[in-house]
Regions:
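A structural signal for multi-pass alpha-helical bundles of membrane permease subunits
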Residues: 4-292
Length: 292
């Protein structure tokens, strides 16, 4: 019996080893090396590295450029998280009922999510630039009333955020629709028999039942926004005057334009810690939803 168990365990280990080796080679080893680099003064391809302790972390947390990128990322995250959640929830509520061609509408709203973020960014740069300028010229709008969507410090970040909302709202719409379909029909039927209208059903039944889904989507959006790189890089390259430079873009500039590999890695570790906290919160909310 014990010999059979040993053989069975050997088979299990044989199946696990390839995945474990892959995980160690492509995740654990690079992370350990990155963690070590964050404590050194590594510069570009220079093989010489010296241990500097927490100097890179202190510099990052006191550097105005990094703190500015962090604040830009927080504003971008708040805008996109709120906008995408509201848009996705509104679309889900509209397309969950008896709507003609609702499957077609769901596919249409989900389609932008299948497109590359770089392509989406270039399309919206063209809309903000060429199409908008052509429309302004056609309508003879005074220059004082014209909007510089990506050239104004106050508007560039939110123009970029609107692009992100347009691209991702369809994905979160499907998650909300799945949550709405899990709500028992008996609850809505009982509310209808009691005379509850559509708004009362949404406010008192659907939204409370969707609270775990809303929380999960919020955290997923926050994680995605903190990692955003493609949209600011493709649309504005961080401009104007750093108004759209996110943490990920700041790390890229530090590593590949300034060649300060150790310092950039320390910034990456800080970003990793922020995302890890948000990921832990996601798992906690998922477990809470399953328990309920």
């Amino acid at each position: 019996m014990q010999q059979w168990r040993r053989r069975q365990n050997a088979v299990y280990i044989g199946f696990i080893l390839p995945a474990a080796a892959f995980f160690a080679a492509f995740f654990i080893v690079p992370f350990a090396e990155s963690l070590w680099l964050s404590f050194t003064d590594a510069y570009g391809y220079n093989p010489e590295q010296h241990f500097v302790g927490l100097r890179n972390y202190r510099e990052a947390l006191t550097n105005p450029a990094f703190c500015s990128a962090l604040w830009v990322t927080v504003k971008y995250t708040a805008f996109v998280t709120l906008g995408a959640n509201l848009t996705a929830l509104a679309l889900a509520l509209l397309l969950d009922g008896n709507v003609h061609c609702k499957k077609l509408f769901r596919a249409v709203f989900f389609l932008p999510n299948l497109m590359s973020l770089v392509i989406v960014s270039f399309v919206w740069v063209f809309l903000y630039g060429g199409v908008y300028r052509s429309a302004v010229a056609l309508l003879n709008i005074p220059e004082a009333w014209q909007i510089s969507w990506l050239g104004n410090r106050r508007q560039a970040l939110y123009s970029m955020g609107f692009t992100a909302i347009w691209q991702c709202a369809g994905y979160y719409m499907l998650i909300y629709i799945a949550g709405l379909q899990n709500i028992g029909a008996s609850l809505t039927e009982a509310a209808a028999m009691d005379g509850a209208g559509p708004w009362a059903m949404i406010w008192h039944i659907k939204l409370p039942m969707l609270s775990p889904v809303i929380a999960m989507n919020t955290v997923l959006l926050m994680i995605s926004c903190f990692k955003t790189f493609d949209i600011p890089m493709a649309m504005t390259s961080g401009g104007p005057a750093g108004a759209t430079t996110t943490i990920a873009l700041q790390i890229y500039n530090t590593a590949f334009r300034s060649s300060r590999t150790g310092y950039a890695t320390a910034q990456s570790v800080i970003l990793f810690l922020i995302i890890s906290l948000l990921t832990a919160l996601t798992f906690r909310l998922q477990r809470k939803g399953e328990e309920e």
